[in-house]
Swiss-Prot record:
Protein family membership: Belongs to the HsdR family.
Subunit structure: The type I restriction/modification system is composed of three polypeptides R, M and S; the restriction enzyme has stoichiometry R(2)M(2)S(1) while the methyltransferase is M(2)S(1).
UniProt protein name: Type I restriction enzyme EcoEI endonuclease subunit
NCBIfam families: restrict_EcoAI (NF046051)
Gene from which this protein is expressed: hsdR
Organism of provenance: Escherichia coli
Organism taxonomic ancestry: Bacteria, Pseudomonadati, Pseudomonadota, Gammaproteobacteria, Enterobacterales
Note: Type I restriction and modification enzymes are complex, multifunctional systems which require ATP, S-adenosyl methionine and magnesium as cofactors and, in addition to their endonucleolytic and methylase activities, are potent DNA-dependent ATPases.
Length: 813
């Protein structure tokens, strides 16, 4: 463009005036092949106390497609004042998310072309007029992928598009495309690993839709092990199949339909007459998709496995959040290595899954154990075996009524501190335990239960009334039930978008099961304020975080006694809300095994509706005792440092070591200088939080209500501590205000009072002038203009006031 000085143009101008014209001139269709400002991530949710916000994320400037949802290339633009290659690294990051081999960086002068299909010359500079055509990139892409001519009709098949604008997320697109690619290449066993809450069923639908529409697969079976999974799938994601789809009922497979949704239990069973799958020939289905395939399809002795073996010629796609790999069960042995994996950690980092905090509650009998006196009878007259009972026994072989009530009381107290209407799932050891927990919660919440008898419901496989409320529990628009007690039924497939509290009072040894249970809370619902959740752990299940197989660590781990939650005057909320992030831990991981527990689900017994019961109540003999004095333990606080290590030392020692090893805080003088030089002290406070300094925990150890500045001067540098009130008194003694006119003195004096009450963060924000008693003096802009002249003068006065506040007493030589 003659006469245009590119160096004065913005990045947007460069895209509009130079890059897009070059791309269009090369033959790319603006409607179907070019997308601008493509947002690939949602932005990680960061929890700050009780509030949560998203980190802002950048979007890819331009993505080029062969056709919608089949991406080929990324173009990253920069203003002309930058080098032509400036955007390359950013573009490569987007390209890895989209699984594309081509990246173009440009500042409007030309392009740097990164071409993974050409290892001999990975990067080259090309002119604007030499931008590749769609056909050129598609041919190179197909060669890079190794596609044959026969595969092209399948891999080019359109996605389903309902016209609403809904499109797959980048990882769903990768999972769909890689699976379709694998099927088109003739692969018959495929595994997809996607974290709970990331849209596995929608992903499965698009895979099936494309293969079905391409006539590559004509008869499809979708297998699940829970009625709710099948019903949700039919009603929601699979709805576009319309009259071509059916749910298998009455143990009858109707060959008139092309897409069949079935419970495993509805088409097989221990008796020959229950094996409905044999009604059709072994080659009837040519595609089988197995939802939650970790639950048994890969187990050699599984009843479900016989279905897969009968239809052995069909392509079989396993979907799971948690592939099972034990001596007895291996998804990978059966399906092969996953064609794509999207982990819990990635989901949280990308902002598609909710982060969480953990509160561990220690009860004395859990830690110390309990032993009956010799010959002691339980409350039903059974003699209790004389041995020490511990955490693994409680609610499994030994029931202590007082422990049940203490757990229920702690749950109740937590909800009262937060919100009694927060959706809560309580995972219990078995149906009996879930029933007793429901009763205890009803007894402790009479005011809520009187408002609505469905405030607490037991939702287990044996209870038709409870199961009938499952849809209401997971419906964000329904307030009741609020608390669901369960054992196995809700561990998988329950889309509880608004669940804000997950309670673990169940012995969990399986990493697979643990991940599934955590997944009940990871869904996000911004409309209803669900951006993060809390795990309340009574059975040390969250020690599985230490297992290397676990990813997606909690924001915070807090170990407390029940009294910390029930005591209104305790600092439980402040500790839980302290703004630190956790990335790891050093707990003993000896519990992280996939061993089969002594007490397990009896898969031989089925409910009348074709679903397995949660457990077999006659499997283990239980003793029921009461009158046990159940106490709480001394409080232990664990916290994560900036390196993600779980710290148990004195927090004062940790703070001192952390500060002194940082050169900016290595001496009192350097700390004071940095503090005084900072235009806003809040910036320093937040910076120190990133180093792992927890102000609430530190203040509790010191035992005084000190300003962050004085906490550090005292703990790290050995200075005598001054309270905020003492600092205010010192400022007033020095007659500092006489340099200002009376109207300004009035404002500064009031700011000083605000500092004494609230701290330095309060007075640094100009919005403080909207609060009482400033509101009686006029609007903020009037206060600043009439009493200080302008905003700059006001900010300077506040800064000088802070310097007066933080003057150190003279040090002796």
């Amino acid at each position: 463009m003659a006469g245009v000085n590119k160096t004065h143009l913005t990045e947007t101008d460069i895209i509009t005036k130079f890059i897009l014209p070059a791309v269009k001139d090369a033959g790319w269709d603006v409607m179907s092949q070019i997308r601008q400002e493509v947002k690939l991530r949602d932005g990680k949710i960061v929890v700050r106390g009780k509030l949560a916000s998203r980190i802002k994320v950048k979007s890819a400037d331009i993505v080029l497609y062969h056709k919608p949802n089949l991406p080929l290339a990324v173009i990253e633009a920069k203003a002309n004042k930058h080098a032509i290659s400036k955007g390359m690294q950013q573009g490569l990051d987007y390209a890895s998310l989209l699984d594309v081999p081509f990246v173009f960086a440009s500042n409007g002068d030309g392009f740097i072309f990164h071409d993974k299909t050409n290892p001999q010359q990975l990067e080259s500079e090309i002119a604007l007029s030499d931008f590749p055509t769609p056909e050129q990139l598609w041919q190179k892409y197909c060669a890079w992928k190794g596609f044959t001519q026969e595969q092209l009709p399948v891999i080019s098949q359109d996605y389903f598009d309902d016209g609403s604008g809904k499109a797959p997320r980048y990882y769903q697109m990768q999972a769909i495309n890689r699976t379709v690619d694998a099927v088109s290449a003739g692969k018959n066993r495929i595994l997809l690993v996607m974290a709970t809450g990331t849209g596995k069923t929608y992903t499965a639908f698009q895979i099936i839709w494309r293969l079905w529409k391409a006539k590559n697969k004509k008869r499809i079976l979708f297998l699940a092990d829970r009625n709710i999974l099948v019903d949700q799938t039919k009603r929601n994601d699979f709805q576009p199949f319309g009259n071509a789809m059916t749910k298998v009922t009455g143990r009858t497979i109707d060959p008139a339909y092309e897409v069949h949704l079935a419970l495993y239990q509805a088409i097989t069973g221990p008796e020959e007459h229950q094996k409905a799958y044999k009604q059709v020939a072994p080659d009837f289905f040519d595609l089988i998709v197995i939802d939650e395939c970790h639950r048994g399809s890969a187990s050699e002795d599984s009843a479900w496995r016989e279905i897969l073996e009968y239809f052995g010629s069909a392509t079989q796609v396993g979907l799971t959040a948690t592939p099972k790999e034990t001596e007895d069960v291996s998804n990978i042995d059966y399906f092969g290595e996953p064609v794509y994996t999207y982990s819990l950690k990635e989901g949280i980092e990308d902002g598609f899954l909710a982060p969480y905090k953990v509160v561990r509650v220690d009860i004395d009998v859990d830690v110390q154990g309990w032993r009956p006196v010799k010959g002691q009878l339980d409350k039903y007259g059974e003699e209790i075996e004389d041995r020490i009972y511990n955490l693994k026994d409680f609610d499994r072989t030994l029931v202590i009524d007082e422990r049940t009530m203490l757990v229920a009381q702690t749950i109740t107290d937590y909800l009262k501190r937060t919100n009694p209407m927060d959706k809560t799932i309580v995972f219990c050891n078995d149906i009996d335990h879930a029933d007793r927990m429901r009763h205890a919660l009803v007894v402790l919440n009479p005011e809520q239960v009187l408002k609505n008898e469905k405030y607490v419901m037991k939702i287990t496989g044996d209870d038709d009334i409870g199961k009938a409320q499952l849809d209401n529990f997971i419906n964000p628009k329904k307030a009741y039930p609020v608390i669901a007690t369960t054992s196995e039924l809700m561990t998988t497939g329950v889309d509880a978008q608004t669940c804000k509290l997950v309670v673990l009072d169940q012995n969990i040894q399986s990493m697979t099961k643990f991940k599934q249970i955590i997944g009940r809370g990871t869904r996000i619902n911004e409309k209803h304020g669900k951006l993060w959740f809390t795990i309340l752990d009574f059975k040390k299940a969250t020690e599985l975080f230490a297992d290397p197989r676990f990813d997606g660590l909690p924001e915070k781990v807090l170990v407390v006694k029940p009294g910390d939650i029930s005591d209104k005057d305790s600092d439980f909320n402040e500790q839980l809300d302290a703004e630190n992030n956790a990335d790891g831990g050093d707990n003993d991981a000896s519990e992280a095994r996939e061993d089969v527990a002594d007490y397990q689900v009896n898969r031989d017994k089925q409910a009348g509706n074709g679903e397995f019961h949660d457990d077999d109540e006659n499997k283990v003999r239980k003793f029921y005792v009461n009158g046990v004095d159940v106490k709480v333990l001394a409080k232990r606080v664990q916290y994560y440092d900036s390196d993600g290590k779980l710290v148990t030392e004195s927090f004062q020692d940790y703070t001192r070591k952390t500060m002194l090893k940082d050169s900016e805080y290595a001496s009192l003088d350097s700390f004071v200088r940095k503090w005084q030089d900072a235009p806003r002290k809040q910036v320093i406070i937040e910076e120190l939080e990133q180093l792992g300094i927890l102000w609430d925990v530190l203040a509790e150890e010191v035992g005084k209500d000190l300003d962050p500045f004085d906490l550090l001067c005292h703990v790290v540098y050995g200075q005598p501590p001054l309270t905020r009130q003492e600092r205010v008194a010192n400022v007033r003694k020095r007659n500092y205000f006489t340099k200002y006119a009376e109207p300004a003195q009035q404002v500064l004096n009031t700011l000083l009072d605000k500092y004494a009450d609230e701290g330095v963060q309060e007075i640094e924000d100009v919005q403080v002038l909207k609060l009482k008693p400033f509101d009686t003096l006029g609007r903020p802009i009037e206060i600043i203009k009439t009493r200080f002249g302008d905003k700059k003068a006001y900010e300077q006065a506040v800064n000088e006031l802070e310097n007066e506040i933080y003057q150190l007493p003279p040090r002796s030589a």
